[in-house]
Amino acid sequence: MSLPSRQTAIIVNPPPPEYINTKKNGRLTNQLQYLQKVVLKDLWKHSFSWPFQRPVDAVKLKLPDYYTIIKNPMDLNTIKKRLENKYYVKASECIEDFNTMFSNCYLYNKPGDDIVLMAQALEKLFVQKLSQMPQEEQVVGGKERIKKGTQQNIAVFSAKEKSSPNATEKVFKQQAIPSVFPKTSVSPLNVAQGASVNSSSQSVAQVTKGVKRKADTTTPATSVVKASSEFSPTFTEKSVTLPPIKENMPKNVLPDSQQQYNVVKSVKVTEQLRHCSEILKEMLAKKHFSYAWPFYNPVDVNALGLHNYYDIVKNPMDLGTIKEKMDNQEYKDAYKFAADVRLMFMNCYKYNPPDHEVVTMARMLQDVFETHFSKIPVEPVESMPLCYIKTDITETTGRENTNEASSEGNSSGDSEDERVQRLAKLQEQLKAVHQQLQVLSQVPFRKLNKKKEKSKKEKKKEKVNNSNENPRKMCEQMRLKEKSKRNQPKKRKQQYIGQKSEDEDNAKPMNYDEKRQLSLNINKLPGDKLGRVVHIIQSREPSLSNSNPDEIEIDFETLKASTLRELEKYVSACLRKRPLKPPAKKIMMSKEELHSQKKQELEKRLLDVNNQLNSRKRQTKSEKTQPSKAVGSVSRLSESSSSSSSSSESESSSSDLSSSDSSGSESEMFPKFTEVKPNDSPSKENVKKMKNECILPEGRIGITQIECSVQDKTSANTTLVHQTTPSHVMPPNHHQLAFNYQELEHLQTVKNISPLQILPPSGDSEQLSNGITVMHPSGDNATTMLESECQAPVQKDIKIKNADSWKSLGKSVKPSGVMKSSDELFNQFRKAAIEKEVKARTQELIRKHLEQNTKEPKVSQENQRDLGNGLTVESFSNKIQNKCSGEEQKEHQQSLEAQDKSKLWLLKDRNLAREKEQERRRREAMAGTIDMTLQSDIMTMFENNFD
């Protein structure tokens, strides 16, 4: 025989659970009917119920250890048969069978199994349907069933077997008349222990508690209805623990103690406890079922396998127990109710880890509880609770019933009298404590009021003293007052309660126009200021203190005058602080006006400089007619160099002033051409050194050095400062470059510095289309050729005509900030190419200078020969002018071509910058918009790849 066959032979299924009540004490109640027709029917139709519709077949499923682990098997078919055959006495027994079925599944299977998930789904449906079950259990057709002979046997059986209410009955509160037995824990172990305790021990426990009487709580109806039946003490002792379903008896036939208990229940409870019962109903509502269901029942330690639960949690609590206490009026005030609810949540937090699912559910349910509990109104302390008056009423009525009941009532009454006396003393102590607290709370406010009066007196004294003090002290006191105003909000929080009544009395009521203006001002406030408005209203209006701060409706007719005045102060203060931006605009406008004034002053200075240059030009023309000697020419050269340096200084100073208002963009755009400072003008010592070092050729007048100060594009005023320096002397601090005229013209086409025209030296001034003329006196050039050893720098004058037209042109063409940035980027890009071009030109210059130095002795000999022949200076200068006339025409044509090229370069640069700006704007516009079709295409591609 194989091993599986042996195992199948060993596995034996036990007989199914019984479903016929052999004791024939089963009943049919409204709750049992609901369980049969609604709960069981819905569970049976559920798609996950098929594993639970029949008893577990251990042989077929090959589960040899199932019935060794599960001692009390249960299934839906057995429950269905028991309901059909009236097996159950009350609904709590049927509910216990359902819970047993689910706990067996959780006990045998692992937590992650499919069968466990199916059981959890069924249990959720079961609890949901169970919450809709009628709360009061009533027997259906009970009067026909109950007979005279069997009533006594039912009472004896119930006294022996069911001495305490069932745990599940405590959870769902299905009793019409609350139980009067001593409170037991909800665990099934205590149920078994309670069954072993006899009725006499229960009576002793009830007497010691002294709350309710034992004698005839469950006396059968026949003992009251029939006059012939005898009343025996032994019978009453056995009939103590009859199940608490009493609906089959009329109310006028019930024993006295039960009628007295109904009177006690009808007494009015406090307003706080009513709110607590509403909170409990809210927590048990359907909308909170998804996260409140673990707290409906006590923790089933055996089913969940939590063997160390009671070692960690000493005081278990659940919503079912809290509801039972609330129904039995065990809560004397709302704080005891809140203590039990919070104990339930603390037990959950204590036993479970913080990241557990039950902890998150507990936090959600606790948020619901705390939000509702915070809205309970506060009530004053009463002299005597109603519950103790109720017990006295039950005593006096109970003493008149029987002798035995009166004796037991006396013993319980004595204990109750002692308790009432103790409670009265405790209440007196509480009153004394409350009075002390009120006195202590009023003392600091009195002190604060005294401090206020003192501070007012001190302020008056300070005002009198301040009239005789210096203005500096007055300023210091003003600063101190401002600091005190800043610190006032902290003091207001402390003095608010004491000043509240005074503010309400002194506040002036608002009329309709003021209220309307206040509402308009509140609507003008920004969103961050509205929170303070809500805080002011809630702090001053008790009726709105519990309202939601996110959404609040304000009715100005219901608000107090003090609240409205406080709102008016706050709103006016906020609106005063807001209009700070218009003055800034005024300041900006004033800056622009100053900027324009500076420009006008600089233009006037430029015109003055031009006038001075014209006067000097006339002086130089008059000097041409006088004959000059070699020595005199040298002295005259030194004077002209000094005058040129002074004129260059004046021009450079004017250019510095004109460029001071610019934003410094010239240093970034054109780093090779910077402003000329006064310190850079050639001194006499430098001129002497230059005489000893270099000699220029005959046809060459001088190599000019250009210095451009390019202003900001908003000013659009450009000036050129031409200064003659030796060819090889180039100060590195300002990156000055020396070129001949042809090379400068070619460089201008590359750099596109300005539309100014640089002309070759000539005696006459040629006016260009741009309105700028460059003057080159010929007389000075003739005198310079008399020196054979060296060549001194020659002055060149600049005259700017039509300055107003240039100003209007600069103002009319104002590129935007975006164009400016693009031009800067493009110029930086051109920087490398320009530097290469400059290096090449400097190398060519050096090479040409070397060639010219070899020709210089020949030129000096020719000059001496001409002087020996008796030629005058004027004839010599005429020769030079005739030689240079052809070259000037060529250079003029080249300059015009260079200007055309520069215009083409400018047009190209502008078009390129415009295209870049359009592209940038298009990208910004595309970045701001969302292409929904592209997004949908991306999502479809993602879904296809995901599948």
From Swiss-Prot:
Record flagged with keyword tRNA processing: no
Positions where Phosphoserine occurs in the chain: S187
Compartments, as annotated in UniProt: Nucleus
Single GO BP term: RNA splicing
UniProt note: domains: Bromo domains mediate interaction with histones that have acetylated lysine residues at specific positions. Bromo domain 1 mediates binding with histone H4 acetylated at 'Lys-5' and 'Lys-8' (H4K5ac and H4K8ac, respectively). The bromo domains also recognize and bind a subset of butyrylated histones: able to bind histone H4 butyrylated at 'Lys-8' (H4K8ac), while it is not able to bind H4 butyrylated at 'Lys-5' (H4K5ac).
Main location: nucleus
Subunit text: Interacts with SMARCE1. Interacts with mRNA splicing machinery proteins SRSF2, DDX5, HNRNPK and TARDBP. Interacts with the acetylated N-terminus of histone H1, H2, H3 and H4. Interacts with P-TEFb components CDK9 and CCNT1/cyclin-T1.
Entry-linked InterPro entries: BRD4_CDT, Bromo_Brdt_I, Bromo_Brdt_II, Bromo_chromatin_reader, Bromodomain, Bromodomain-like_sf, Bromodomain_CS, NET_dom
Motif annotated as Nuclear localization signal, chain positions: 209-220
Species the sequence originates in: Macaca fascicularis
This protein's name: Bromodomain testis-specific protein
Start-end of Basic and acidic residues biased regions: 470-481, 674-690, 849-865
Chain coiled-coil ranges: 417-470
GO cellular component: chromatin; nucleus
